[in-house]
């Protein structure tokens, strides 16, 4: 028996990295998982990983998966993700918004198109998806919404002149917005028994994207494997909703607080 038996989950940005790891972990605990992202076939992205591969890995392990090709920047695609999930798997009990588009560019160099795309994928998409799944969650008496954030949402704790993170301002702004959205929505739906949380890695997760941007590397001291985020996400998406809601949580700290071993691989 898995802790998510009978549950239906949507995980966006699930072609690789944190999203794929969360999807596999949820499926291993019994959830039927809809994996959504743009990359459906190898060669469509400069990064390895597709939703077809994630879905195949889940099925190979005996789980249930639905691959949904979608561009999270498009409102119609967000609607289709939920509609296809409902049609093929049932009403979603869990929503994990993980999809991201990132440009590490100083503010002066940002184009209007880049800004709009980042905001659409990282703020508007989680907002609209939450709107779409909330009625079904409320009807069934419970639900779990998890928005993946980043330590970039916090102000740098060192003097500005010593801060080496030039180019992360817009990314951090988007993540700060999603954290405020998460805590505010948690208050709005508390009486409906729906948990809403934001979760960040304690350290940088080596994914194709973070490695490409030279933020970390495999086995680096400043890194943690994606399994840590997946385990923390599981905690926030299966316990009694009112017991863990309104959190801006960090993966390793959350696992330590709840006395859950940190998976290192």
Predicted regions, residues:
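Conserved glycine-rich cofactor-binding loop
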Residues: 8, 15-16
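The beta1-alpha1 cofactor-binding region of Rossmann-like NAD(H)/NADP(H)-dependent oxidoreductases
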Residues: 49, 69-80, 112
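Catalytic loop of short-chain dehydrogenase/reductase
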Residues: 146-191, 202-205
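Conserved glycine-rich Rossmann-like NAD(P)H-binding loop of the short-chain dehydrogenase/reductase
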Residues: 29-53
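A short, exposed helix-loop element centered on a Lys and neighboring polar residues
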Residues: 130-131, 183
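C-terminal helical subdomain
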Residues: 191, 198-199, 216-265
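Substrate-binding pocket helix/loop in short-chain dehydrogenase/reductase
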Residues: 106-107, 114-116, 159
